[in-house]
């Protein structure tokens, strides 16, 4: 399955919520009519079945983190095999992706831009270049922008934007050095309350 490269507003309208696919310079409501479904007429959504609700939640989370269907299924299997709550394990695995950590640290204004930085070898982990967006970052790892990319305007602007919106507590960043530490894997209470991971667990349990 190919990665979606079309309009981001279309995805937000499909899920009826902000997927944080845009930079956040303007409120999502001023850019996308997320109350209306995709299409010219933007019909209002009808009542969904339980399955439809579960599927939409999975698609929402998958799109937030920019993960393909097969990848997401793999993350779920890994989460189910670990101790603890499967839904929480799933979100933690997604949060530990390198492209997501780069986004959380503010080196990229969106997860898509952060993924591109990783793929273009602009990011290092513990001093070693890593170009795999799905690389799992561990507590204590140092994630940094490589010297060759430090002066990129988009990185400078992303850091400024992150300073405005605020940075999550589980990363510590030196904006001048463009380097940060992934302090710990976030607890479920640290993550978005707008995600209902139990619906995803119910979907995969069928």
UniProtKB/Swiss-Prot annotation:
UniProtKB keywords: Ribonucleoprotein, Ribosomal protein, RNA-binding, rRNA-binding
Any GO BP: translation
Pfam families, per database record: Ribosomal_S4 (PF00163), S4 (PF01479)
GO molecular function, one term: structural constituent of ribosome
Ribosomal protein recorded as keyword: yes
PROSITE patterns xref list: RIBOSOMAL_S4, S4
SMART domains: Ribosomal_S4, S4
CDD domains, per database record: S4
Domain S4 RNA-binding span(s) in chain numbering: 96-156
Domain of life: Bacteria
GO terms under cellular component: small ribosomal subunit
Protein role: One of the primary rRNA binding proteins, it binds directly to 16S rRNA where it nucleates assembly of the body of the 30S subunit. With S5 and S12 plays an important role in translational accuracy.
HAMAP family per UniProt: Ribosomal_uS4_B
Entry's family note: Belongs to the universal ribosomal protein uS4 family.
Quaternary context: Part of the 30S ribosomal subunit. Contacts protein S5. The interaction surface between S4 and S5 is involved in control of translational fidelity.
PANTHER family per record: 30S 40S RIBOSOMAL PROTEIN, SMALL RIBOSOMAL SUBUNIT PROTEIN US4M
Descriptive protein name: Small ribosomal subunit protein uS4
């Amino acid at each position: 399955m190919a990665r979606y490269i079309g309009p981001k507003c279309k995805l937000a309208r499909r899920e009826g919520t902000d997927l944080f696919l845009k930079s956040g310079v303007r409120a999502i409501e001023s850019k996308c009519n997320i109350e209306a479904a995709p299409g010219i007429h933007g019909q209002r959504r009808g009542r969904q079945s339980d399955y439809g609700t579960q599927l939409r939640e999975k698609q929402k989370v998958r799109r937030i983190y920019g993960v393909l269907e097969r990848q997401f299924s793999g993350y779920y299997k890994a989460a189910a095999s670990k101790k603890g709550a499967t839904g929480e394990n799933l979100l933690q695995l997604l949060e530990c992706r390198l492209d997501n950590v780069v986004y959380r640290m503010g080196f990229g204004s969106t997860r898509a831009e952060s993924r591109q930085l990783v793929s273009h070898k602009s990011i290092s982990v513990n001093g070693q270049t890593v170009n795999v967006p799905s690389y799992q970052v561990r507590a204590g790892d140092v994630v940094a922008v490589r010297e060759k990319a430090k002066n990129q305007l988009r990185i400078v602007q992303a850091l400024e934007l992150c300073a405005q919106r605020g940075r999550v507590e589980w990363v510590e960043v030196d904006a001048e050095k463009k380097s940060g530490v992934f302090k710990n894997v976030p607890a479920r209470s640290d993550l978005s309350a707008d995600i209902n991971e139990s619906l995803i667990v119910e979907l995969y349990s069928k």
